[in-house]
Regions:
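Solenoid-repeat scaffolds in large eukaryotic assemblies
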Residues: 86-89, 93
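Elongated scaffold/linker segments in the mid-to-C-terminal portions of large proteins
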Residues: 33, 99-218
Length: 218
């Protein structure tokens, strides 16, 4: 919805799932300001329940954490013209990163992280053990899952393939070894004769229809 209201301003705003034909499908457009306020309220409500930091480095950047929520809140507050709350959200991110930097520095004295202006921990642009530049770019955009990353779509490299296992497990055909379309988990109320224990519900990996191609024998 954040993308939609920035592109089109007022858009239909629905917060409940459509489970049958009794739902109203012709919904009038909601005002930009009302949707923005609703998004902010939802994020503020769940922020304190979000994970602060995972122990796994990849999960820490590929899953939404409190830092990720604060970053999104900062952007939302910018569009709302609420400068104080925007600054507060960014300050929380910086404070969190400073604490992480101190922890890393204790364990890895030769870390490539540096304090910019003695305040903001960032990745040094100098490659370790050499005077070559480009280390920061490679860490952020090449290797990925970097210290500076708040949230990114992580893809796993190996054996010549690049994929996102989580996305494949939930939204792709699990019969395939690589990411491809063809899987969707059915909501239990859609039909009583459709199995819900398996993620694979399409008859064919190349059939994009939903109900018609669901595996009713599951």
């Amino acid at each position: 919805y954040f993308y939609l209201i920035r592109a089109y301003k007022d858009v239909p705003y629905v917060t409940i799932p459509s489970t049958d034909d009794t739902n109203e499908f012709v919904v009038p457009a909601e005002k930009f300001e009302n949707i923005l306020d609703s998004l902010i309220m939802d994020l503020e409500e769940v922020r304190t329940y979000a994970v602060n930091k995972y122990t796994n480095k990849k999960a820490n950047t590929a899953r939404f954490t409190r830092n990720g929520i604060d970053a999104l809140l900062a952007d939302l507050y910018l569009w709302d013209g609420d400068w104080d709350n925007c600054i507060a959200a960014v300050d929380r991110i910086v404070a969190n990163r400073v604490e992480e930097y101190k922890e890393i520095l204790e364990k890895e004295p030769n870390t490539t992280l540096v304090l910019f202006n003695n305040e903001y921990p960032l990745i040094s642009n100098l490659s370790p053990g050499s005077g070559n530049l480009g280390n920061a770019y490679n860490e952020i955009f090449g290797r990925g899952n970097s210290f500076e990353t708040l949230f990114e779509l992580a893809f796993e490299g190996g054996s010549g393939s690049v994929e996102n296992t989580f996305i494949r497990n939930y939204y792709a055909d699990r019969r395939q070894s690589s990411t491809s379309i063809g899987s969707l988990k059915v909501e239990a109320r859609v039909a009583s004769n459709i199995g819900t224990s398996s993620n694979v519900v399409y008859k064919s990996a190349y059939d994009g229809r939903v109900y018609e191609s669901m595996d009713k024998d599951g």
